[in-house]
Amino acid sequence: MNKPRYFKEAFAQLKPYEPHLVSYEIKLDANENPYLFPKSLLEEIFSKIGTRDFPLYPDPLAGRLRIRLSEKLGVLPENIVLGNGSDELILCLYLAFGGYGRIALSFSPSFVMYRHHAFVTQTEFFEVSYRDDFSLDLDETKKAIEKYQPHLVFLANPNNPTGTLVDIETIKKLLAYDHLLVVDEAYVEFSGVSAIDLLKKYQNLVILRTFSKARALAGLRLGYLVASVDVVKEIIKVKNPYNVNVFSQIAGEVVLANEEVFQGEIKEIVAERERLYNQLASLGLKPVKSHANFILVEFGEKAKKIHQELINHGILVRYLGGALANYLRITVGTPEENRQLLKKLGEIL
């Protein structure tokens, strides 16, 4: 049966992003911060919300939070745009610089929303495959840039789902072309490597970041973009006017004012990542060296079966399928969560 004419034929094959919602005891599938949000900070957030905050629209540019971020990053407030998660800002980049007749380039495997938003905005999309060890092939990337002449290039660094990292010198080489290079630093706190200082020299660089990972605000949806003033102006033209709610804005301010709390958690997660990597390798598995808060692990042809076995025991990890059908992506949990995961894997294997 044909659908009415107001449905888009092009969207018939488009699949929505659907997380696997099943019951669990240990959740290691979405790269979230495994620690409980500090109660003292939650109380501080509530204490800063007034009775007039809810009936009034929020600041459309999240002015106070914008200033706090600018002070932390050493840029102007005018270099920053806040978003309802960095996912929204990816869409805004496509709305401002992509669209019909425009071209975007990214890498494979990488974050699925680059491709998704390209499709939604009718932006032609191409990918360069990572090498077998998931490192970036600069020669192939240059060939693709010269062939397709993209307007937008998306680079997740560290990359999701592999956890691998591209060095700053390589990023400089990618900035030598006439395109907007978007470096998605969602996991930067776990790698310690950022391209943000390059903004002083390169007007065609965009840095994407989020409060969802290291800063434990995934449930509030808060991200930000740092770029030249001219690029920021274009993003503001296309974003929704009141895109970040007042609760998220205040939470962001409180989190930034209490960075030491999260720095301690970051150190623990990084230490656990290294321990988990070594323990997975000792089980005879092939983990990929990670610079994020997760580890991609090769399980061979049994990956999907093992994924289901873990679900049956209340442990969620991410099965990726496709070209990564032999892999599972495992978020670094608390020491106890990781211990239980390793124990169960030892029994399954």
Swiss-Prot record:
InterPro entries found in the cross-reference section: Aminotrans_II_pyridoxalP_BS (IPR001917), Aminotransferase_I/II_large (IPR004839), HisP_aminotrans (IPR005861), PyrdxlP-dep_Trfase (IPR015424), PyrdxlP-dep_Trfase_major (IPR015421), PyrdxlP-dep_Trfase_small (IPR015422)
Obligatory cofactor(s): pyridoxal 5'-phosphate
Reaction catalysis annotation: L-histidinol phosphate + 2-oxoglutarate = 3-(imidazol-4-yl)-2-oxopropyl phosphate + L-glutamate
Broad enzyme group: transferase
EC number(s) given by UniProt: 2.6.1.9
Swiss-Prot/TrEMBL keywords: Amino-acid biosynthesis, Aminotransferase, Histidine biosynthesis, Pyridoxal phosphate, Transferase
Gene Ontology molecular functions: histidinol-phosphate transaminase activity; pyridoxal phosphate binding
GO biological process: L-histidine biosynthetic process
PTM annotation (N6-(pyridoxal phosphate)lysine): residues: K213
UniProt pathway annotation: Amino-acid biosynthesis; L-histidine biosynthesis; L-histidine from 5-phospho-alpha-D-ribose 1-diphosphate: step 7/9
Family: Belongs to the class-II pyridoxal-phosphate-dependent aminotransferase family. Histidinol-phosphate aminotransferase subfamily.
Xref: NCBIfam families: hisC
Protein name: Histidinol-phosphate aminotransferase 1
